[in-house]
Design a protein with these regions (language model features):
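Immediate post-signal peptide segment of exported/extracytoplasmic ligand-binding proteins
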Residues: 20-34, 65-70, 166-172, 331
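Extracellular/periplasmic periplasmic-binding protein-like sensory domains
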Residues: 243-315, 376-379
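Extracytoplasmic ligand/sensor domains, especially the bilobed periplasmic-binding protein
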Residues: 97-205, 254-275
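Solvent-exposed loop/turn segments at secondary-structure junctions
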Residues: 38-41, 78-82, 106-111, 130-135, ...
Length: 380
């Protein structure tokens, strides 16, 4: 009887705490889920993001949390593999019972997870490292998109900025290297569309498989046209391998790539050979502490990590989620969180703004062009 009584008290306490709010919400905690690569060639991207989010959550919790509740993060490694990302999302929602999702990674993984798991389960995801159109559709066109909130510009925005810059410099022989997945295909479509506006087409197109550095064939295809510029829709390992392969072939085009490459990681991989590579960015310059959101981000990470575009983007994602949870009130539910996010129109995070509405999931159109200078410094 004593055991049964203790069990009953425990069950009543558990029921009381879980009934405090939605799934993943108790009187004292809010559980947030994350799936991203923490291992493999893309592991450094996810590790940087997780470090920043954990640091920011600590800051929020030390200041009293949100309506007395502390934020907890449950982060799973997907290795930038679509099947694993989908499985992790299912685990986070069904087994771990998280309240919401934060900071995913990759176009194909996020699109599949949205359409197969979190969109169907009506669990919001705030932020992913992807500019794919598939996760930016209006909820009117795909009801699963109602639960996807992007905080960065699209690949169409990035590639248009890159192409416009190259064309303004008089370049007419522009080739494309893309990785064979959702990211690569979205970027390729963006380049083709942007060139079409200038009555141009890519002079050559070549591909590399995701998570691969086997770029010799692609470099040979592109080198044949002696391009003035190459837009590389690839991550840092493949990008570095391609640049080196092209230089071995005595090719010296203007190399351009998109924000997911990670400037710091590309510099680590290429060393001095990274000099001159242009990169489109979708966040403010993370070393410019005159921008309030950058200053906050730098303060949060302290000496735990070096400033980076990935780190700043993770901070922006986490801040958008925290702001929306605060606006949702103490009686927290997923639907209230969605409503709070949809009400964020021209929401100022401190020099960086995001906008949503019931039918808008783009979040931002901000694009900046940078170039890697001497010593691996990112220059604007």
């Amino acid at each position: 009887m004593r055991f049964l009584g203790a069990l009953l008290v425990g069950l009543l306490g558990w029921v009381g705490s879980t009934l405090a709010g939605e799934v993943g919400v108790t009187d004292k905690t809010i559980l947030i889920g994350m799936t991203a690569p923490f291992s493999g060639s893309s592991g450094p991207y996810g590790q940087d993001m997780r470090t920043v989010i954990q640091a920011y959550f600590r800051q929020v919790n030390e200041a009293g949390g949100i309506n007395g509740r502390k934020l907890e993060l449950r982060a799973l490694d997907d290795g930038y593999e679509t099947d694993k990302a989908v499985a992790n999302t299912r685990t986070l929602i069904s087994a771990d019972r998280v309240f919401a999702l934060l900071a995913s990674y990759g176009s194909s993984p996020t699109t599949a997870a949205m359409n197969e798991v979190f969109g169907v389960a009506k669990v919001p995801l705030v932020g992913t490292i992807s500019g794919a159109d598939s996760i930016r559709q209006s909820p009117k066109d795909n009801r699963n998109n109602r639960y996807m909130f992007n905080v960065r510009a699209s690949y169409a925005n990035e590639t248009e900025a890159i192409v416009n810059q190259l064309v303004s410099l008089g370049f007419k022989n522009i080739a494309v290297l893309y990785q064979n997945d959702g990211f690569g295909n979205s970027g390729l479509d963006g380049v083709v569309s942007a060139l079409k506006k200038h009555n141009q087409t890519p002079s050559a197109i070549a591909t590399v498989e995701r998570n691969s550095t086997d770029v010799a064939k692609a470099a040979a295809i592109i080198a044949k046209v002696n391009p003035q510029a190459v837009v590389m829709v690839t991550l840092y390992k493949a990008t570095a391998a391609f640049v080196q392969e092209m230089r071995k072939a005595k090719q010296a085009p203007q190399f351009m790539t998109l924000s997911p490459v990670g400037a710091d990681l590309l510099v680590q991989e290429l060393g001095d050979e990274a000099r001159g590579v242009g990169i489109s960015q979708v966040m403010p310059y993370p070393w410019n502490d005159t921008v309030p959101v950058v200053r906050e981000y730098q303060s949060v990470i302290g000496k735990q990590a070096k400033p980076s575009y990935y780190g700043l983007e993770a901070y922006v994602m986490a801040k958008v989620l925290v702001d929306a949870i605060r606006k949702s009130g103490k009686d927290l539910t997923r639907e209230k969180l969605v409503a709070s996010l949809e009400a964020m129109q021209n929401h100022d995070l401190g020099g960086y703004r995001v906008s949503f509405s019931p039918n808008e999931r783009l979040g931002s159109r901000y694009v900046d062009l940078t170039v890697i200078g001497s010593g691996g410094r990112v220059l604007r």
